[in-house]
Curated annotation (Swiss-Prot):
Pfam families, per the entry: M60-like_N, Peptidase_M60
Annotated Gene3D superfamilies: Peptidase M60, enhancin-like domain 2, Peptidase M60, enhancin-like domain 3
Gene Ontology BP term (one): hematopoietic progenitor cell differentiation
UniProt subcellular location: Cell membrane
Protein name: TRPM8 channel-associated factor 2
Keywords recorded for this protein, A-Z: Cell membrane, Membrane, Transport
Length: 919
């Protein structure tokens, strides 16, 4: 049986060479939503006239006018449809009396069809028009159990009698077909021009249902002027992408949605971006509106999941019939739950499709932080439930606040509508997408493209439309000399193109001109697979990037193969190392996201990245695989030197070849990633890397960490950073202007390299002895001082201008003249405290104290407690009462700590005494 959309389309269109539609009948345009429905016939204006869908165990074919089901000219298609709808050969084919002429068409082709007033108990095919209002429940259950339904009709005439705003949810046919995501609309379908498609036609981006949805907005926001979402949690941003989904709450930028709703089938959904919003008393007016809307005023038998006990209490207080339940039951009219389990996903989706109301809330940013390499849009439990409703929870956050309700006109912004306007604008037509929405379109589009699209025409259709848009528009040439605004159409194109490539779409035509913009334009990928061996053992407590020494060119895909044990060990593949996300930068010197990471959870995987990049295998913490062979196709070698392994001859040969644009210099403790052009003049990396290893040993020694490092630190140069001149992390990021500082042995020896060691110091900082914001940019500099003095022989006074004696003295005096206020104790002023301790007691107390902190099980979060612990422990190390010293610096000394330290000799001649005496 043809169970996939592609196979179904092929079966339905077998032998169909033309669409012979009778001209005297005007069809209705069909609206498709959800993940199951797809079009079979689409006219030249993009209107769907015949659609197919699945529901439960059964299938539907929906035709936009009942007369088409009785037209002999469509016999080839009708015969295919009936054949495809049959659950198995020989099952009964039954036709409602309203389509009696169809019986003759079927019998004329040898199909034994019978006229029956309703579908029988035996599962087969039932054919009916869309105007019957008495068989709704029976038809839905017939399909759900595995039957096939052929249904046809138009809704524009019904709308003229009952009102256009009632068509979607009250037209008889829609009460049946909507459960499978197909709606008859009151919009006339044009039948002048259409062609027979060879593959599933594209679904129109957007059908305007403003009036119906505006009425729903009004009901949900009735009597509400403000939404206060300061409810104790940080909400996620919501992505509203379904044609019948709409926003309810936006932040003050009108760009971040935290509350939304949708119609799906015969049911309704309300989504909050954090479950705390469903339990907060300040959200009470909205929650009551939501329950009324979801239940259509019935408000009986509301099921509240046990995770939302406070919501249950709130509803009981208002006399609503509700109860705490551990799971969804069939007798509920509304189900309220959090978005953190997908165990009942299918059951919830069918509950909504058949008329139930769903109130659900949750955030996905925490899940995303705990599952790097997995897409929150595809794998977060809440999104497994919600995506089909046209709503998704993004892993981005919304700053909690109190936001006014301005009854959002969804004509201003809706993802599909914005994409449609964007397409029109790029085609030099009358698109009117506001400039400020282009940034949101890029973010939303990138999110939407992370929803798994394989086998889902609704999503693949958007991919196809985007490919066409981007192919026509071309990729903007973005660089430091040619930046683009982050809220420009060019930035949106960059974001959409990036994520489209990550989704697996063929972007070769989009990327064909990329190489001409880069230094890799004269490179070609290896025709033969390359096998490299990486270390699959990671005893540490953090994931490790393992370099492959290979580079994937722009716009290319690579096939990566590993063994069965490796595929089940939690490995990931990463393309690129420039991990800063520049989405919120004012100007862009490169695309906002240029790296891609995915799970290597099968033995062979195809991976692509529009922007190319060095290839890495990420080994998870605790992994014990040992040596792992990785076979990679379609990549080029990149310059790579490993201290102690790469010979000078190998390096010279490597660097002379036409290689990837980025290379790496590595030791067991640090890896430098810089442009290949900066490595061309490096004749022998060994002395440079030996010095780097000496510096890294000093970093580890001061931090009381094992050496060699369990995970080498990484430093990567980039054309643009998300913050600062450099920033810490894994990897440490620096600007291109700092590359020479990293790779010039002479410069390091003579001038030092304060910045990189400062960032390495950040990576050693520990919560227990950090007092943010005071010491955040202070204690990291201890490593800069230590490395410069103990390894490079550069005194602190020469290592940084701020450490000249006159500068230090000036800061001390200013601090004391102000009364030593703690709020002034930051950065260089705070560093001075530690330098004075070091200059009297040496480095050893710091080293032993940092080691001791690693053994302390519990340290309070507040700064005052942490500062007193540091005071106490340091005093014990040096066997002196340091209370007078820290009091002079303005530290808040606790009485019990002062009393405990009274047994030690008091440090009265501390370095501040000379300044205090002169006041």
């Amino acid at each position: 049986m043809a169970t996939t959309p592609d196979a179904a389309f092929e079966a339905l269109m077998n032998g169909v060479t033309s669409w012979d539609l009778p001209k005297e009948f005007t069809p209705s345009e069909l609206l498709l939503i959800g993940e199951a429905a797809f079009p079979v016939m689409v006219n030249d204006k993009g209107q769907v006239l015949i659609a197919v869908s699945f529901y439960g165990q059964g299938r539907l074919v929906v035709v936009s006018h009942e007369s088409y089901l009785m037209h002999a000219g469509l016999a080839p298609f009708l015969l295919n449809a009936v054949s495809w709808l049959c659950p198995s050969p020989g099952t009964p084919i039954e036709v409602h009396s309203s389509l009696a002429s169809l019986v003759n068409i079927l019998r004329g082709s040898g199909i034994n069809a019978l006229v029956q007033p309703e579908p029988g108990e035996a599962l087969g095919v039932y054919c009916i028009d869309a105007y019957n209002d008495t068989l709704t429940k029976k038809l839905v259950q017939f399909v759900k159990r595995g039957g096939g339904l052929l249904i046809g009709g138009q809704a524009w005439n019904w709308a003229s009698q009952h009102g256009s705003d009632k068509v979607l949810f009250s037209f008889p046919g829609n009460k049946v077909t909507s459960v499978a995501g197909v709606y008859f609309t009151d919009v006339y379908g044009d039948i002048n021009r259409f062609k027979v498609s060879k593959k599933i036609p594209k679904i129109p981006l957007y059908i305007r249902c403003w009036e119906e949805l505006r009425h729903d907005q009004d009901q949900l926001l009735d009597g509400i002027s403000m939404l206060d979402v300061r409810t104790g949690g940080v909400p996620s941003q919501l992505l509203v992408h379904g044609s019948l989904a709409f926003p309810l709450g936006l932040d003050n930028s009108f760009l971040s949605c935290f509350l939304a709703a949708a119609h799906y089938g015969r049911g309704r959904v309300v989504l909050a971006a954090h479950e705390a919003m469903l339990c907060a008393p300040k959200m009470e007016p909205f929650l009551l509106n939501a329950i009324r809307w979801l239940s259509r005023g019935q408000e009986d038998n509301i099921g509240v999941n046990t995770r939302l006990k406070n919501l249950n209490s709130l509803l009981l207080k208002h006399g609503l019939k509700c109860s705490l339940e551990s799971h969804l039951t069939d007798d509920m009219c509304v189900y309220c739950c959090a978005a953190y389990s997908d165990q009942e996903a299918k059951k919830i989706q069918e509950f909504v499709a058949e008329g139930g109301g769903l109130l659900i809330g949750g955030q996905s940013w925490w899940w995303a932080s705990q599952n790097p390499g997995s897409s929150a849009l595809g794998s977060f439990p809440g999104n497994v439930i919600l995506n089909t409703f046209g709503l998704s929870i993004l892993p981005r956050t919304v700053s909690p606040g109190c936001f006014p309700i301005l009854h959002i006109d969804i004509r201003n912004y809706h993802f599909r509508g914005a994409l449609s306007e964007f397409q029109a604008m790029l085609n030099h037509k009358e698109g009117n997408l506001e400039k400020r929405y282009s940034g949101k379109l890029g973010v939303d589009g990138a999110g939407f493209l992370q929803i798994p699209a394989q086998g889902v025409p609704a999503y693949l259709s958007v991919h196809r439309i985007l490919r066409k848009i981007l192919r026509q528009a071309g990729l903007p040439a973005v660089s430091k000399s040619n930046p683009v605004s982050s809220h420009s159409y060019e930035a949106a194109i960059l974001q959409l193109a990036t994520e489209l490539a990550h989704s697996g779409s063929d972007c070769s035509q989009i990327a064909h001109n990329l190489s001409s913009q880069t230094c890799s334009s004269n490179l070609s990928s290896s025709e033969h697979p390359i096998t490299v061996e990486i270390n699959g053992t990671n005893p540490g407590d953090r994931d490790v990037w393992m370099s492959t020494g290979l580079y994937l060119l722009e716009g290319q895909s690579t096939e990566i193969s590993v063994s069965e044990p490796a595929a089940s060990a939690g490995l990931k593949v990463q393309i690129g190392c420039h991990t800063d996300d520049l989405t919120f930068a004012i100007k862009l010197f490169r695309a906002p996201v240029v790296t891609y990471q995915c799970c290597m959870n099968r033995t062979q995987r195809s991976v692509s990245c529009l922007w190319g990049g060095l290839l890495y295998i990420i080994v998870p913490k605790g992994c014990q695989l040992g040596p792992v062979s990785v076979t990679i196709t379609n990549a080029v070698p990149a310059p790579y030197y490993k201290l102690g392994k790469t010979s000078l001859e190998e390096w010279k040969s490597c660097i002379q070849k036409n290689l990837g644009p980025w290379g790496e210099l590595a030791t067991d403790n640090v890896i430098l990633t810089v442009p290949t052009a900066s490595l061309k003049t490096l004749e022998n990396p060994e002395p440079l890397l030996q010095l780097w290893d000496e510096m890294m040993q000093a970093v580890a020694r001061l931090a009381s960490q094992p050496f060699p490092f369990q995970r080498p630190e990484r430093i990567v140069a980039d054309v643009q950073l998300s913050a600062g001149w450099m920033h810490s992390g894994y990897p440490i990021m620096c600007h291109m202007e700092s590359v020479q500082e990293l790779v010039s042995l002479a410069n390091i020896r003579s001038k030092g390299l304060w910045g990189p060691i400062h960032e390495l110091g950040h990576n050693q900082q520990c919560r227990g002895w950090e007092f943010p914001p005071h010491t955040t940019e202070a204690t990291c500099n201890l490593w800069s001082v230590y490395v410069h003095e103990t390894v490079l022989g550069i005194p602190r006074a020469q290592a940084h201008p701020q450490l000249k004696p006159e500068e230090r003295e000036k800061r001390i005096k200013e601090h004391l003249q102000k009364g030593a206020p703690l709020q002034n104790w930051n950065v260089w002023t705070a560093l001075e405290t530690y330098l004075q301790l070091q200059e009297v007691f040496g480095w050893e107390p710091f080293i032993t104290l940092f080691a001791e902190y690693q053994t302390i099980f519990y340290i309070p979060e507040d700064n005052e407690c942490k500062m007193n612990i540091w005071l106490k422990l340091f005093s014990e190390k040096v066997q002196k009462n340091l209370v007078p010293f820290f009091e002079a610096w303005g530290w808040p000394i606790q009485k019990d700590v002062a009393e405990d330290l009274a047994c030690y000799p008091s440090w009265e001649d501390h370095p501040l005494r000379m300044y205090m005496g002169s006041e």
